[in-house]
C-alpha cells in the first residue's frame, strides 16, 4: 500500500468504507507481513527530529552583526600593530575587544534555538505504547511501530497514538480531551457515524494523535501516522517559522550599518590625511630603511584610524540594551508577565494590534449562571438574575424580577426541584482554597456553574456554604444510576431514590433530567409551577418557554441554556438502563421545571484595559473558536462592539474568511474586531495578513494548535495555564491569563523604548565626542589626546553605568496616550541626530580644548604640537612630553568623563528641562554617576592603574608619584587642573538646555499647525 492510496477524507466515509480503503479486516487486523510492508512505505510513527545546529555555526552566527565585525577587524589590526611594535601594553586593547566579543557571542549562543523546545514539548504528547489488533490477537506494541490500517483499541486514560477513524464503540459514549489541538476545555463527544459536508476542523468520528480519552472505550483504525498527523502538521508549522529580528534589533542593525559606513569613511580620510602629512613633514634621509620610511608611518597612521574606530563604536551598547531589557522583564514579572525573550520586551511597546483569544483571557474561564426561570401559577415566566461572575458563593446574590430575594427556594417549588436536579445530575465538585480565598472547581466548568447556582439559590450561610445545599440534596436522595449524555438525544439523567422517611410512594423513585432545553421541552408533557403544582404542558406554556429561551440565548445575551425536568418512575431494577438505544424512551413523558442560562463572563478589568488600548492607538481583535453569537455578546459587554444587531465588516467566522478573495481578506483584517469559529490555520493566516500590512502584531494562545501562530507573530503571548508547547513557542507568558496584564506590559514596553532612546542618545553623543576628539587631533597632526585603552574604559565602564541607570527612568505620564511607533520609524530622527551631533561636537572640542590648554599653559606653541612627529631626539624633554603627554591625557580623559556624567543628567528626559525633570527622580542614575567618577579617580590615583592607562594623577607632585607603591592611594595637593576640567565640562548642561528649549518650541509650533 502506498501513501497516495490512503483515504483523503476518512471522516466522510463509513467505518466499513474506511476499512476497505485501508485493506484491513477490523475483526482480525493487519498481518505481520502487511505491517512490515507498510512500515517501509510510510516510515515509523514519530515526529521527525532534526539534528541540532552545530555549536560552531551558532558561534559564527553571532559575528554577523556589522558592529561586531568592525570590532573584530579593529582587534585584529590592533593585535598586528602590537606584534609589530613589540610593546606588551599594546596587547591590552585587542584583548579587551576580544573579551567583549566572546561575552556577546556567549549570550547569543545561549539564547539560540528556542524553537527546539517547542518541538520537543510536542513529542511528549505522543504515547510510548499502543494496544493493537494484529493477526487476530490483541498485542501491546511501541506506538512508533503503528502503520496506516492498524486496528487500535483506546480506553479511558489512554493518549491516542495516531490519527484514527472510530469504527466501533465499546461503551455508551466516547469522549476525548482535544484541548491540545483546539484550545477548548469542553470534552469532544465521539461517534462512529460519518460526518459529511463538515465544517469542523476535528470531526466527531475521528480521534487524533496526542489527545486523551477521558471516557469510554472504542476500536479505531489508523489513517495517519508521524508527520502526517494533525500534531505532525503543527510540528512542521512550528519548525518552518523562522526567527525574525524584533523591530528594536532591526533599527539597531540599521543604525550599526550607518555608523559603520560613517566610521569607515572617516577612518580612511584620517589615515590618508595623516599619511600625507607625515610624508610632507618628513623628508627622506640616507640612513632611512624601507621599514622606517614606509612601514612605521603607515602603522602609526593605521593606529590612529583604529583608535578612531574604537572611539566611534559604542562597545557598551549591546550590554546596556540587554541590561535595560532585563530590568523591564523584572518589572513585567511583578505584573504577572513572564518574558522568555529579552528583545520582545520592547516589541510589545510598538505593537499596533493585539489578537486575543477569548476564553480565559478576556473572560474569567469560569462558567457562571446569570439567569434562570420557572413558570408561575398563571403560566407566565418567573425570572431570576444571579450576580458575581466567579465560583464564589455570595450571599443575597439573587434577584427576582428586579427585587432581591433572600430565600428563593422557599418561595418557588419549581426552582427547588430545578436546584435539586442541577446538583444530582452533576459530577463536578467545589472546594474552598484557603490560600487564594477563592472557590475552585474539579470537573467540567458547566457542571460547576450549576453547583454554584444551586448554592446561591439555597443561600445557606456558614463556613460550609460552598457545598451546603449539595450535602442537603445528597442526604435526601440516593443516586442509583446515570444515563450518560449522547449527542443524539442531547441530554443526560440520573435515577434517584428518596431517602426521606414517609415520602409518598409516587415520588420515591425519580428520573432527574438535564440537557438542551429544546430537547428536554420536546419530551415533556407536564410542567411544574412555582407553587409546586404539576399541570399539563399546554401550547401556550410551550410558546412562552421558547420565547424566553430565545430571549436569553440570542442577541447581546447569547447565554448557553440548559433545561431541567423530572419524571416519577419505577425502582431502578425495573427500568431498562443497559441499552443506550432506549435512553430517549426512558427520558420521555417528562415534567419540565425550568431552565437556566450561563456564560463565561468577561473579566471586570478587561473593559478598562481595552479603553486604554484605544487611547494608545492599539486595535484589539478577538480570535476564538467559540460560536459567533456568544463571541459577539462578549465583545458587546467589553465595548468592542456597540451592538449585535449589525456587525457587518466587524465580525467574521472562519468559514467566511476562507470564502474571501485576498483583497477582501486584507480589508477585513483592517476593520474587524472579531473572528469566531476559527481553527489554527486561521490564526496563522490572520497573523500573516496583519504583518503584510506592516502592523506589529501580538498574539495570545494556550493550546498546542496555537504554537505556529504564536511563533509567527511579532510577539507570541502564551497563557500560564496553557500547554508547554504554547509556552515554548511564545516570547512571553501571562501567569494570570489576564488581558489587562498585556496592556500593562505594553506600557512597560513603551517605557523601555523611551529609556532605550535616552541611553542611546547618551552613548552616541559621548561617542561622537570621542570621534571629534580623535578626528581633530588626527587632522591637525596633534599628539594623541586619548589612547584606545582609555576609550575602551570610558565606553564600557565609565559610560556603561549611567547608561544602564537611565533604564530606571520613570515612564512619561502620557505614555499610553501616544500613538504606536511606525515600523519604519528610526530610533534617531533627523533633528534628534542633529542634537546628538551638537552635544557630541562640544564633548569632543572640550576634551581637545583641555588637552591643548595644558600644553599651551606649559609653554608649547601650536607649531610644536602640529609638528611633534618631526622630533628625532627622544632624549629631548620636549620631544618626550609630546610623544607621551601623560598629564595632558589625564586632563583630556577627566574632561571626557565629567562632561559625560553631566550629559547623563541631560538624558533624564528627551525634552524636559532639568528644572522639571530633576536628578532626584532617578536615584540610580545619581548612584551610577558617583560610581563612575569613583572608578575614574581610582584609575588616576592608584599608581598601578595610572600606569596601565598611561596617565598621571592630577595635582600630585611628580616626585611623590615616582616614589609611590603600585597599590598606594595618592592625594592631590594642587587643584588647578581640576578647575580647568570643571570649566570645560559644565557648559554641556546649558547647551543641552538650549536645545531642549528649541525642541519644545518646535513641537508647540507643529501642534498649532495641526490645530
Swiss-Prot record:
This magnesium-dependent enzyme catalyzes the hydrolysis of ATP coupled with the transport of the calcium. This is Probable calcium-transporting ATPase. Its EC number is 7.2.2.10. PANTHER family: CALCIUM-TRANSPORTING ATPASE. It is an enzyme of class 7 (translocase). Belongs to the cation transport ATPase (P-type) (TC 3.A.3) family. Keywords: ATP-binding, Calcium, Calcium transport, Cell membrane, Ion transport, Magnesium, Membrane, Nucleotide-binding, Phosphoprotein, Translocase, Transmembrane, Transmembrane helix, Transport. It comes from Trypanosoma brucei brucei. Residues 85-90, 279-303, 795-835, 906-922 are extracellular. InterPro entries: ATPase_P-typ_cation-transptr_C, ATPase_P-typ_cation-transptr_N, ATPase_P-typ_cyto_dom_N, ATPase_P-typ_P_site, ATPase_P-typ_TM_dom_sf, ATPase_P-typ_transduc_dom_A_sf, HAD-like_sf, HAD_sf. The active site is at residue 357. SUPFAM superfamilies: Calcium ATPase, transduction domain A (SSF81653), Calcium ATPase, transmembrane domain M (SSF81665), HAD-like (SSF56784), Metal cation-transporting ATPase, ATP-binding domain N (SSF81660). PROSITE patterns: ATPASE_E1_E2. GO terms for cellular component: ciliary pocket; plasma membrane.
Amino acid at each position: 500500500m502506498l501513501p497516495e492510496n490512503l483515504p483523503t477524507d476518512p471522516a466522510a466515509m463509513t467505518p466499513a468504507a474506511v476499512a476497505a480503503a485501508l485493506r484491513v479486516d477490523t475483526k482480525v487486523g493487519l498481518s505481520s507481513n502487511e505491517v512490515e510492508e507498510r512500515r517501509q512505505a510510510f516510515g515509523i510513527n514519530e515526529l521527525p527530529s532534526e539534528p541540532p545546529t552545530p555549536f560552531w555555526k551558532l558561534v559564527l552566527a553571532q559575528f554577523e552583526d556589522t558592529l561586531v565585525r568592525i570590532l573584530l577587524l579593529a582587534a585584529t589590526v590592533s593585535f598586528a600593530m602590537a606584534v609589530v611594535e613589540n610593546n606588551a601594553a599594546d596587547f591590552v586593547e585587542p584583548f579587551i575587544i576580544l573579551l567583549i566579543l566572546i561575552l556577546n557571542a556567549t549570550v547569543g549562543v545561549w539564547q539560540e534555538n528556542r524553537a527546539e523546545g517547542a518541538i520537543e514539548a510536542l513529542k511528549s504528547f505522543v504515547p510510548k505504547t499502543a494496544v493493537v489488533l494484529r493477526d487476530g490477537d490483541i498485542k501491546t506494541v511501541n506506538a512508533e511501530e503503528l502503520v496506516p490500517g492498524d486496528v487500535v483499541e483506546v480506553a479511558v486514560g489512554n493518549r491516542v497514538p495516531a490519527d484514527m477513524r472510530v469504527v466501533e464503540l465499546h461503551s455508551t459514549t466516547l469522549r476525548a480531551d482535544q484541548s491540545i489541538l483546539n484550545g477548548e476545555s469542553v470534552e469532544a463527544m465521539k461517534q462512529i457515524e460519518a460526518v459529511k459536508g463538515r465544517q469542523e476542523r476535528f470531526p466527531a468520528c475521528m480521534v487524533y494523535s496526542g489527545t486523551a480519552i477521558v471516557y469510554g472505550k472504542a476500536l479505531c483504525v489508523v489513517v495517519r501516522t508521524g508527520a502526517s498527523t494533525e500534531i505532525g502538521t503543527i510540528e512542521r508549522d512550528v519548525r518552518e517559522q523562522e526567527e525574525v529580528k524584533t523591530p528594536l534589533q532591526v533599527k539597531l542593525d540599521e543604525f550599526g550599518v550607518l555608523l559603520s559606513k560613517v566610521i569607515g569613511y572617516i577612518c580612511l580620510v584620517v589615515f590618508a590625511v595623516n599619511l600625507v602629512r607625515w610624508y610632507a613633514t618628513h623628508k627622506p634621509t640616507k640612513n632611512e630603511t624601507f621599514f622606517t620610511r614606509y612601514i612605521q608611518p603607515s602603522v602609526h597612521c593605521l593606529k590612529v584610524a583604529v583608535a578612531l574606530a574604537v572611539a566611534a563604536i559604542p562597545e557598551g551598547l549591546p550590554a546596556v540594551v540587554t541590561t535595560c531589557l532585563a530590568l523591564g522583564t523584572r518589572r513585567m514579572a511583578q505584573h504577572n508577565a513572564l518574558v522568555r525573550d529579552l528583545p520582545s520586551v520592547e516589541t510589545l511597546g510598538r505593537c499596533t494590534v493585539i489578537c486575543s483569544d477569548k476564553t480565559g483571557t478576556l473572560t474569567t474561564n469560569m462558567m457562571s449562571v446569570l439567569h434562570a426561570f420557572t413558570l408561575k401559577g398563571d403560566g407566565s415566566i418567573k425570572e431570576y438574575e444571579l450576580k458575581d461572575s466567579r465560583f464564589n458563593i455570595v450571599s443575597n446574590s439573587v434577584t427576582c424580577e428586579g427585587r432581591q430575594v433572600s430565600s428563593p427556594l422557599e418561595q418557588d417549588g419549581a426552582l427547588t426541584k430545578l436546584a435539586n436536579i442541577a446538583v444530582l445530575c452533576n459530577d463536578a465538585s467545589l472546594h474552598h482554597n484557603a490560600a487564594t480565598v477563592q472557590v475552585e472547581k474539579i470537573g467540567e466548568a458547566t457542571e460547576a456553574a450549576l453547583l454554584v447556582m444551586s448554592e446561591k439559590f439555597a443561600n445557606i450561610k456558614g463556613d460550609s456554604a460552598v457545598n451546603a445545599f449539595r450535602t442537603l440534596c445528597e442526604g435526601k436522595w440516593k443516586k442509583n444510576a446515570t444515563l450518560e449524555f449522547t449527542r443524539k438525544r442531547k441530554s443526560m439523567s440520573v435515577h434517584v431514590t428518596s431517602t426521606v422517611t414517609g415520602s409518598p410512594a409516587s415520588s420515591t423513585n425519580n428520573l432527574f433530567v438535564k440537557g438542551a432545553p429544546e430537547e428536554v421541552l420536546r419530551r415533556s408533557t407536564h410542567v411544574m409551577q412555582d407553587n409546586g403544582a404539576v399541570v399539563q404542558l399546554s401550547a401556550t406554556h410551550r410558546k412562552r418557554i421558547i420565547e424566553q429561551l430565545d430571549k436569553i440565548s440570542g442577541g447581546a445575551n447569547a447565554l448557553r441554556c440548559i433545561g431541567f425536568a423530572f419524571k416519577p418512575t419505577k425502582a431502578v431494577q425495573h427500568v431498562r438502563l443497559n441499552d443506550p438505544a432506549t435512553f430517549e424512551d426512558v427520558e420521555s413523558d417528562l415534567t419540565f421545571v425550568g431552565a437556566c442560562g450561563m456564560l463565561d463572563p468577561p473579566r471586570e478589568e478587561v473593559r478598562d484595559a481595552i479603553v486604554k488600548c484605544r487611547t494608545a492607538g492599539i486595535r484589539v481583535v478577538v480570535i476564538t473558536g467559540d460560536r459567533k453569537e456568544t463571541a459577539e455578546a462578549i465583545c458587546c459587554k467589553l465595548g468592542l462592539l456597540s451592538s449585535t444587531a449589525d456587525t457587518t465588516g466587524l465580525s467574521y467566522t472562519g468559514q467566511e474568511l476562507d470564502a474571501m478573495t485576498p483583497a477582501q481578506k486584507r480589508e477585513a483584517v483592517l476593520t474587524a474586531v472579531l473572528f469566531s469559529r476559527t481553527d489554527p490555520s486561521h490564526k496563522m493566516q490572520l497573523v500573516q495578513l496583519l504583518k503584510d500590512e506592516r502592523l506589529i502584531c501580538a498574539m495570545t494562545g494556550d493550546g498546542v494548535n496555537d504554537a505556529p501562530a504564536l511563533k509567527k507573530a511579532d510577539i507570541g503571548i502564551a497563557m500560564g495555564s496553557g500547554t508547554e508547547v504554547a509556552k515554548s513557542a511564545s516570547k512571553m507568558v501571562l501567569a494570570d491569563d489576564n488581558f489587562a496584564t498585556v496592556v500593562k506590559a505594553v506600557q512597560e514596553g513603551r517605557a523601555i523604548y523611551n529609556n532605550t532612546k535616552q541611553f542611546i542618545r547618551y552613548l552616541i553623543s559621548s561617542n561622537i565626542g570621542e570621534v571629534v576628539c580623535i578626528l581633530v587631533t588626527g587632522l591637525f597632526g596633534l599628539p594623541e589626546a586619548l589612547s584606545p585603552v582609555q576609550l575602551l574604559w570610558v565606553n564600557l565602564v565609565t559610560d556603561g553605568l549611567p547608561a544602564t541607570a537611565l533604564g530606571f527612568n520613570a515612564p512619561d505620564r502620557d505614555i499610553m496616550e501616544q500613538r504606536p511607533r511606525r515600523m519604519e520609524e528610526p530610533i534617531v530622527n533627523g533633528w534628534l541626530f542633529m542634537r546628538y551631533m551638537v552635544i557630541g561636537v562640544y564633548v569632543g572640542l572640550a576634551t581637545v580644548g583641555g588637552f591643548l590648554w595644558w600644553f599651551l599653559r606649559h609653554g608649547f606653541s601650536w607649531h610644536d604640537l602640529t609638528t611633534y612627529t618631526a622630533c628625532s631626539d627622544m632624549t629631548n624633554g620636549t620631544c618626550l612630553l609630546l610623544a607621551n603627554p601623560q598629564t595632558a591625557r589625564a586632563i583630556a580623559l577627566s574632561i571626557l568623563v565629567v562632561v559625560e556624567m553631566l550629559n547623563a543628567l541631560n538624558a533624564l528626559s528627551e525634552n524636559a528641562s532639568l528644572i522639571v525633570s530633576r536628578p532626584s527622580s532617578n536615584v540610580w542614575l545619581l548612584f551610577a554617576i558617583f560610581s563612575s567618577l569613583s572608578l575614574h579617580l581610582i584609575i588616576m590615583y592608584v599608581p598601578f592603574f595610572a600606569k596601565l592607562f598611561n596617565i598621571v594623577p592630577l595635582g600630585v607632585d611628580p616626585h611623590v608619584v615616582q616614589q609611590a607603591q603600585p597599590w598606594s592611594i595618592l592625594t592631590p595637593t594642587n587643584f588647578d587642573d581640576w578647575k580647568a576640567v570643571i570649566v570645560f565640562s559644565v557648559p554641556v548642561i546649558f547647551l543641552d538646555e538650549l536645545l531642549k528649549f528649541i525642541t519644545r518650541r518646535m513641537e508647540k509650533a507643529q501642534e498649532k499647525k495641526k490645530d
